[in-house]
């Protein structure tokens, strides 16, 4: 659907599976006059994204290697996918009921999005945080500038949106991030939540506020420490 949207044309899709680990998709342009594909649905954080391309592209140089029928980056397998695919996937989760306790869901507050969007955003945040917390990678953050560098290295190179500004709020590690809108925003917020918890060794709470073209994320400790 993303390719059809970009090419303004319809395609036939067929696939072959050479082995248990590889599926090859074959696209052939369709000449018949058939109904157009559905447009990509919008969330609050995907509107006006065409104004925000530069933060997605300025991630520096890196080398991706063709290996074993796929792509390899720094020893890890990876894939390339259009960001709109993520939006389509998340849009289909809006009617799903979240299976998480009140203690978890109440650790994140939202301003500026609908209840259906809150459910989708929250599910994505905790899923991404859970994936990162499974790794053993240490996270050390000593200053606001290190947040930017860490995000560029761990998120930006893989196509995820990075914060445009970072500012410390107090001596207990609370910090606020400013983002432009992006289809990958929920994933980046979930990653930052996991990074913060690992760097500070505390359970995080988040306040997320959406404006017309930006999102502001405040992360602080869920528990009060004396």
Task: Indicate residue ranges for each PLM-predicted region.
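N-terminal accessory segment detector
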Residues: 1, 11-184, 210-226
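Short, non-transmembrane amphipathic alpha-helical segments
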Residues: 2-7, 189-200
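Low-complexity, intrinsically disordered Gly/Pro/Thr-rich segments
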Residues: 8-13, 199-209
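Short, surface-exposed linear patches
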Residues: 46-49, 198-202
